[in-house]
């Protein structure tokens, strides 16, 4: 890019053979020469630059070149791990949704990841998460609008770390399964087990935080206190006191449901 092709001479003179300073003043991202096409990873890097500096725009001739690089199949040869690395960097930028907008505009998404659709919901959520949220949360937001039937195929092709793909699947499921409507001890316990909340309470708390950011739940209090109520039970004591050992699972189930019901009653009284 012309803005990256400037240098300062020892005597303080600006060395600017391609007009980078003028492009910098105007906020324009412009390629230097036809050699730009030699590295198809630049399709992603320029898009990421836009997400980092949203007040810049891509020059029309550079946009055309990016589209040619996609249409010619140059991007098909990209090593998936290099693509994944660029995506992960883009998720850390100030306006990550712009990265995906640019990749849609130049045809990269349609050609390489046709399942990866963005909507106003996923774009808005992604940008709300730009500051103070984790990589898992941002990646989950970026695939929030993907058809659930196509999500696994997309995740496999992206080759993201396991913790990112698992959390993305959990969030996608939680957007659609109506879990938030659980209102009594038995149904809440079923949700906690389905979300693996009792074994992985930190991840569940992270999920709730993201669901609040997505305006899917108003509060996480019911869920966090229910997790704490069950995890604080003395399962060993329950097991040891059972005269019929075959009933231990049922006794634990009943104690867990009771603990959650008591918690829900307290919350109702408080509010």
Q: Can you say where each PLM-predicted feature lies in the sequence?
A:
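Glycine- and charge-enriched loop/helix tracts that form the active or gating conduit
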Residues: 1-160, 271
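C-terminal subdomains that position terminal phosphate/3'-OH groups for nucleotidyl transfer/ligation
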Residues: 102, 115-271
């Amino acid at each position: 890019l012309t803005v990256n092709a400037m240098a300062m001479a020892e005597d303080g003179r600006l060395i600017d053979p391609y007009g980078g300073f003028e492009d910098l003043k105007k906020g324009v991202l412009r390629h230097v020469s036809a050699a730009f096409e030699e590295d198809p990873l630049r399709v992603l890097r320029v898009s990421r630059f836009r997400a980092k500096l949203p007040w810049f725009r891509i020059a029309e001739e550079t946009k055309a070149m990016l589209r040619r690089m996609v249409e010619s199949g140059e991007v098909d040869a990209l090593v998936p791990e290099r693509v994944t690395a660029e995506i992960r960097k883009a998720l850390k930028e100030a306006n990550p949704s712009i990265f995906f907008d640019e990749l849609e505009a130049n045809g990269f998404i349609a050609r390489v990841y046709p399942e990866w659709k963005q909507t106003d919901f996923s774009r808005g959520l992604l940008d709300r998460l730009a500051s103070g949220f984790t990589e898992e949360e941002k990646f989950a937001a970026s695939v929030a609008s993907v058809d659930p039937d196509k999500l696994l195929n997309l995740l496999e092709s992206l080759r993201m770390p396991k913790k990112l793909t698992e959390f993305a699947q959990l969030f996608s499921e939680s957007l659609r399964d109506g879990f938030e409507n659980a209102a009594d001890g038995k149904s809440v316990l079923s949700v906690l087990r389905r979300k693996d909340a009792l074994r992985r309470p930190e991840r569940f708390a992270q999920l709730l935080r993201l669901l609040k950011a997505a305006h899917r739940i108003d509060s996480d209090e019911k869920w966090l206190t229910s997790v704490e109520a069950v995890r604080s039970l003395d399962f060993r004591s329950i097991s040891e006191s059972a005269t019929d050992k075959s009933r231990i699972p049922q006794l634990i189930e009943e104690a867990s449901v009771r603990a959650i019901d008591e918690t829900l009653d307290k919350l109702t009284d408080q509010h």
